Design a protein with these regions (language model features):
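The feature marks either
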Residues: 1
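P-loop (Walker A) phosphate-binding loop of NTP-binding proteins
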Residues: 374
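Non-catalytic regulatory/interaction regions at protein termini and inter-domain linkers
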Residues: 12-49
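Conserved ATP-binding subdomain of kinase catalytic cores across diverse folds
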Residues: 34-235, 239-243, 248-324
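Short, low-complexity intrinsically disordered segments enriched in A/P/G/S/L with frequent Arg
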Residues: 4-5, 11-13
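Intrinsic-disorder-associated interaction segments
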Residues: 8, 26-33, 189, 212, ...
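Intrinsic disorder/low-complexity segments enriched in polar/small residues
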Residues: 10-12, 198, 285, 361, ...
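ATP/Mg2+ or Mg2+-diphosphate-binding catalytic cores
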Residues: 327-371
Length: 375
């Protein structure tokens, strides 16, 4: 994992704030989690007793940076799409995360490790005793080499994106097509649009209709009139298990290029058309200030995979992904104790503007779009 937090995470938060959230409402699971967090925040918990332990908090995990290693702890949470309240579910998730990241991030994910209460009642990393939680142990990477950091510094160049495309193409070409019912996939898209619409139009969030309406109308129109294009991708065998969370902060330009944090907790969330996943990455790069990356990703993947979907389908993918990110951003405000609450409406509006741009620009390869151009 990188040695500083990815976009969307809070950097080195005060321990008391993290413990307050871990202990929320005095729940037993929260109390046990708070004990583990306090233990892992101490340098004495780790081999070699590092001088300092830095903590990064995300929605689903806590990451502890200790010298050249990273220790990732799943939070005992229950959401619509995942339930980590049981120790066994966290163990399974840790083991799965270790396994599925070997291909795209070799040498980064080192092992899983139990947190144990020994006979004296003390917590230790490994050893004999009662297992009370699990960690994924990773090699610490240089955050300066992450794609998001390089975008921020203005250092990303077309050859970098070409190499990312080559890594992705090798990965996709090595995957087996999934035997999925087209109606199942269409149902997922329809449900996704329904959830997006419900969230973005919730009066509690006060998102402006001029940002919401055009992309929602476009998404509904596509599903009503062009859904056969989605079914065709299934029938052509283009649906496979992708990365599942292909964000710029998860791409380490190296060398070598490493793609970390492949989504582990639900394989169905990795089911995708490679071009859908790549448009997601392009949208994220555009939000960070590098809109030229999106068309290069799409054209590079088309060249390497030997095909390019119809432009109307790519436009749907772009619009859907931007709207989905807007939905996930604004729904942070539904959390019992949302972190940085002022941030999420701003971020949702930024994604909605990108969704609108994807519609206004049509073919993004024509050189007239704000999503094209070169650095």
């Amino acid at each position: 994992l990188l040695d500083s937090p990815a976009t969307g995470q809070d950097k080195r938060l005060p321990l008391n704030g993290i413990l307050d959230r871990a202990n929320l409402a005095g729940r037993e699971a929260g109390s046990a989690h708070a004990e583990v967090v306090e233990f892992l925040s101490q340098p004495g918990a780790y081999p070699g007793h590092p001088a300092d332990v830095q903590i990064i908090e995300s929605h689903m995990s806590l990451v502890f940076l200790a010298d050249d290693l990273v220790y990732k702890l799943k939070r005992p949470i229950k959401l619509d799409f995942v339930d980590f309240t049981a120790i066994e579910s966290r163990r399974v998730s840790c083991e799965r995360e270790f396994e599925i990241n070997q291909q795209l991030a070799p040498g980064v994910y080192l092992r899983t490790l139990p947190i144990v209460r020994n006979s004296a009642g003390s917590l230790t990393l490994g050893g004999e005793g009662e297992v009370i939680d699990w960690l994924v142990v990773m090699r610490r990477l240089d955050s300066a080499q992450a794609l998001d950091a390089q975008i921020e510094r203005g250092e990303v160049r077309p050859p970098d994106i070409k190499q990312v495309c080559e890594v992705l193409a090798r990965f996709y070409l090595g995957q087996t097509s999934l035997d999925v019912d087209p109606d199942v996939m269409l149902g997922r898209w329809e449900e996704g649009v329904r959830l997006i619409e419900n969230a973005l139009t919730d009066p509690a969030f006060s998102l402006p209709s001029e940002l919401i309406d055009p992309p929602l109308v476009s998404l509904r129109r596509f599903l009503a009139n062009e859904s056969d294009l989605l079914a065709a991708r299934v029938e052509l065998g283009r649906i496979l298990e992708g990365h599942g969370d292909l964000k710029p902060e998860h791409i380490h330009l190296g060398p070598p290029i490493l793609l970390i944090d492949r989504l582990e907790f639900d394989e169905r969330l990795r089911w995708c058309d490679p071009f859908d996943e790549v448009t997601f990455l392009g949208i994220e790069c555009a939000r960070l200030g590098a809109p030229w990356i999106a068309p290069q990703l799409e054209s590079g993947m088309a060249r390497l995979l030997g095909e390019r979907p119809p432009e109307v389908l790519l436009e749907f993918y772009r619009c859907y992904r931007a709207c989905l990110r807007a939905r996930l951003s604004i729904e942070h405000l539904r959390d019992e104790s949302p972190r940085t609450p002022s941030r999420w409406p701003r971020q949702a509006r930024a994604y909605l503007r990108l969704a609108g741009e994807s519609l206004k620009n049509g073919d993004q390869t024509n050189g007239n779009s704000s999503l094209t151009g070169s650095p």
